Amino acid sequence: LKRKMQSSHVLEFIFYLCFFLVSVYLFLIILSPLLIQSDNRILLGIGAVSYISNVLMCHQLPERSLELFGQYMPICSRDVGLFAGVFVACIASFASDKLPKVLKSSWLAILSVVPLGVDGVVQLFGFWESTNASRFATGLFAGFCISYYAVNVFVGPPRLSKRTLTALLVLLPFLAILLGTSVYVGSGYRTKSEILSKAKAINNDTDIKVFYIAPRAFSSSIRNDEYLRDYNDTVLSDVSRIRSSSGAYGVWVAVASGDSNGRYIFASGNGSNYFYDAMSGELIAEFKH
């Protein structure tokens, strides 16, 4: 009985640790599009670290990501849905006794993967390109059902205890490392305002909008997107043509163009696009349309 109680305490601690990690991660993902545009070096650094650290997590394609604050998120809409589902499941587990028992069933957890798989497979094999709404919805559903089932099987209804505080304390070194890394990265990163000034020094005749392109999207994902031809977007087209070792930590693109039309992410009208290395501020490429 004592060993069983110890095992239960360990699982409860793991639950709280995962819950806090997912909460911090999701919070950063949502705020990153705003932070990356900040002139404050620390806030900019936090946003930059979020984009850079997710190169192994996601393809980071802007055309498959949600837009917040005029900027695309560090991970795609499907991944955002998955993590949001995990977060909601953790919250819901505190009230599991009041929720329908069907949510705890193993078959629902298994079936929840089907919509996610169908949505991804039909796109992978080129039948059609799924929408951000379907990506987010299927990710949210699968993330919630699987996580809610796992919590109820291995942990049960969680309770606030000393393990809650212990999990928070374990998280503090991670937050300290994140802050320290953000200060370091932010001190060398070019701000959106700096890039706008650089672009205006070249072209001051047209309104200029500045966007951030995540590292993996710039280096490989955009040019490998088989649905790129379906977009009337000059920026995406330009990125697919750039062959440069720069941009390993992300790229700023200054778009100087008129009215856009058709299906696009950044811009599709006549004008000029200026690509800058986000770390050095070096002008990587310039295209006129």
Language model feature labels by segment:
Residues Y184-S246:
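Short, non-transmembrane alpha-helical segments in secretory-pathway proteins
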Residues F13-L43:
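N-terminal signal-anchor transmembrane alpha helix
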Residues Q37-I75:
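Extracytosolic (periplasmic/ER-lumenal) interhelical loops and adjacent juxtamembrane/interface segments
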Residues V22, A84-I91, T138-G156:
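Hydrophobic cores of alpha-helical transmembrane segments in multi-pass inner/ER membrane proteins
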Residues Q60-S77, G117-G143:
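Interfacial helix-loop-helix junctions of multi-pass membrane proteins
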Residues G262-H289:
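A short, surface-exposed beta-strand/turn
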Residues K162-V185:
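Internal/C-terminal transmembrane anchor helices
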Residues L21-L28, L103-F125:
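Small-polar-interrupted transmembrane alpha-helices in polytopic inner-membrane proteins
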